[in-house]
Amino acid sequence: VLVNGTFAQGCELDDYYDQGGGHPGAATVPVILALAQQQTVSGQELITAMVAGFEAGWRIGRALLPELMTRGYHAQSAVGVFIAATAAGKILRLDPEQMTHALAIAGSHSGGTMEYDQSGGEVKRLHNGMACCGGLRSSPWRAPSRCSWSSRKSACTTR
């Protein structure tokens, strides 16, 4: 996923949505193809996962941009992880609660600064690959346990 995600945006030939969400195809396709190689997935499930990833990217991107970039964050790195987690969650058939947890975990993988713009670094090429990996790592965390905050301490329980 890291290699395919990096390659998907590395040559700057990928899709682009200028009102938010960056490059949803670059964050969706590597993840759903990797999961489809590991389990049986129908064409309809692939398309549904792709559409869900695009939709998540557009909605989250529109909510965060342009402020995200003016604060120094690369939109694809920050939003792409949610795109990837949503697409992976659809392929893995997560229920709404599991998807919520996957997206919450994806938030911890979100990041990537625009420093490459100032220094000419090539790390930008890696941002989408890292977003794909973060989204993929976020989604399998759907075990039947739940962590919540009590009044004074964190308590994890199993159902």
Predicted ranges, named:
Residues 1-158:
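N-terminal core-entry segment
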